Every structure is written in structure tokens, then in C-alpha cells.
Amino acid sequence: MIRFACLLLSLFLIACSDSSDDNPPDKALPDFTMADTWLESFVATEPLFPGGSMIIVDKTAGVIHKSAFGNQSEDSVVLLASTSKVPAVTLLMALHEDDANVNFDISAPITNYLPWLGVWDSAITTENLVSNRSGIPGLFNIFIRPADYAPHLCQFLPAGTLLECAETLFTTSLPNLPSTKPNTAFDYGGSQWQLAGGVAELVGGGTWHQLWDQYIAEPCGLQVARFGNNLSLSDGWDGNPDGLVGLANPNMEGGMMSDLDDYAKLISLHLNDGACGGNQVLSPEGVAFMRKDRSPEVGYGMGWWIKAPKQGGSVYLYDDPGYYGSISWIDIERGYGAVVFFEEYTGTAGGVGSGGVTSQLIPIIEEALDAVR
């Protein structure tokens, strides 16, 4: 009997040992050495880019890589310019989805929510505003026809309040600049984005900062990321969050500051169907709605640029580049996203940074990820 019991015990232990062979091995981590080499070399050879940093986020594993070179550290706080656009739209979508507390439809005319008599087409929606299809003259007019765009300069200045600026933009025409009917043409950036912020404050019943904290920062656990208006003062930025100005009139399309860790949480939200940690900030449908292509001629959703697919493939890459060189992106096929921070605050060569990431760094990261898939 004892011998039989020992035999049964031996068979049981062998079975337990064999069953462990069925467990899959731990997933190998990608090797991002070549990605780091690229970023380190870039900041060493580009005189207007003395530093750079990046963070890579996996949909399920979270942060899988972080690095910094030159005069940046992994904790640097940077001004993001247009890499603010996706976060801004994320808040607008959160308001749109809060049916229990907020009367707001992002696809309804903004005249439903604004108390002023406007000069622009009454059919304009907030969706039009943040897809750059409102018909209101866009951002590039400030560079090519600055005198004609001057009546709308409040969006770039730290003085005043967001609602005061929104009223000015909504009630002041730009007669010497071309405009179109809403949802008929793509005209990037500018007044339409600041006007969307005014809509948010009116429907949300609080300042942009209060709404940002309530709907995004607190549920996502953000520590640093917030909006201000340093666009006219960016060349003096020293990385101190206390130097953020224009808190009462934050710039919607380009006023955000952040560190890597906070921005990574926003990327994770868009990878995980609107979930930030244990909190559902947006619905899966809301996240997908931001990626819907509204301007196929250029590839743009709401905040996201949509990268053309490779021949025979489908769209998988969405990005949000900024004037100072930073760029964020998500890859819905590989289930990862990332952001690279640059600080080219002269504004003369930001595209060198974001363009280099798009054409050179992203393929390197894709290769590293594909090697362990």
C-alpha cells in the first residue's frame, strides 16, 4: 500500500512538472538600442535640437522604454505646441459623452451653446472646429498675411480669458482672408481651435483647467500636464512648470506642457479604448471617432493626422506633430504608441525633428517590435 501511494505521488509530481511546459514563456522585450542610437545621434548633430527624449507605451504592458539625451532628462517638462491637439480633443470628447451632466453634442452647431451673435456660418459644429473644417481662416494666415489676421491674435497671447478671446473670435470677421462653408475644405489650426475651448467652458460650466482636472488629469493620474499660453514666450522656457503663463486663456491647439510620464498615460488611453488605469475616460466609440478621417485629401481626423497605409495595407498609424519638433503617435496594429519630445523653440525647424521621427525613428521602432512579435 505504501509503495502504491508513493507511485501515485510520483506520477502526480511528474504530471505537475510536465504541465508547466504548456505555459507560454514570458514575452521577450523589444531591443530599442537602435532607436536610442538614432535619437542620441540626432541631438548630437542637429544644432537646433540640443536635447531629445522619448517614451514607448505598449497597450497591455504599459511603458516599455524611456530614454533621454543631450540637455533633456527623462523628467524634462516641455512645451508641446500642436502635440497638444489630441489631448484637447480628448477633453472635448469626454464632455460630449457625459450625457448625465453636460448638454453637449460635438456634432451639433456651436450656436446652440454660444451666447453671442456671431459672424461665421451658423452651421459650424465643434467637430468641424477640431477637424479643421469650420471654414474659419486657419493658422497659416498669421505667417502669410499677419496684418489681416491680427484681429484674432488673442488666441496666441496670455492676457485675458478664454471666454473673452472666444467671443472676440466668434464676433470678429476677417474680411480680407478666404473662408469657406463648414465641412467643405481643410484649413489647419487657428481660431477654430480656440473657439472650441470657449464652447467647452460654456457647456462644462467651468474653466478649461477645472474641466481638464475633472475629466482627464484626475482619472488618469496626471501630475504635470496642463494647458497655458506661452506661444509668444516659448524661447524663454526653462522647463519650470511654474513658468507656464496664460492659465486663464490657455491655447487649445498648442498650449500644453507635459513630461514623458504624463503624456504616456494619454497615449495609453488611446490604445486602450478610452481607459486610463482603472477609469473609463472615453468610450471605445469615442476614441475611434477621433480617428475617423474627415479630410481624405490630407488624412485628418480630430487631432490625429492619419498616415497613408502601405500599398495593399490598411491604416494603422496616427500622429500628432508639433511646431517645436515633438510628435506623438499610436500604432493600432502593433498595439503601441510613443511620444518624442524636442524643444526647437525658435520655430524655424521643428519639422526636422518630427519629420525625422516619422521617416527614420518610427521604422526602427517598428522593426524592434516586429522582431519579438
Spell out what each predicted region is.
Residues M1-L8:
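Sec-dependent signal peptide recognition
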Residues L13-A15:
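C-terminal motif of bacterial Sec signal peptides marking the signal peptidase cleavage site
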Residues D18-S67, D75-S76, G204-G206, E218, ...:
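Catalytic loop of the DD-peptidase/beta-lactamase superfamily, centered on the K-T-G motif
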Residues D31, A35, L80-S84, A88, ...:
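Hydrophobic (often cysteine-bearing) scaffold residues that line and stabilize catalytic clefts
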Residues D36, E40, M93-H96, T111, ...:
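Non-transmembrane alpha-helical segments in soluble domains
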Residues L48-P50, G70-L129, L177-S191, N251-G254, ...:
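Short active-site loop at a secondary-structure junction
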Residues K66, V77, N141-L233, P250-A264:
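Catalytic-site signature segments of enzymes, centered on catalytic residues
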Residues T83, L95-I142, S191, G198, ...:
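Active-site helix/loop module of the DD-peptidase/beta-lactamase fold
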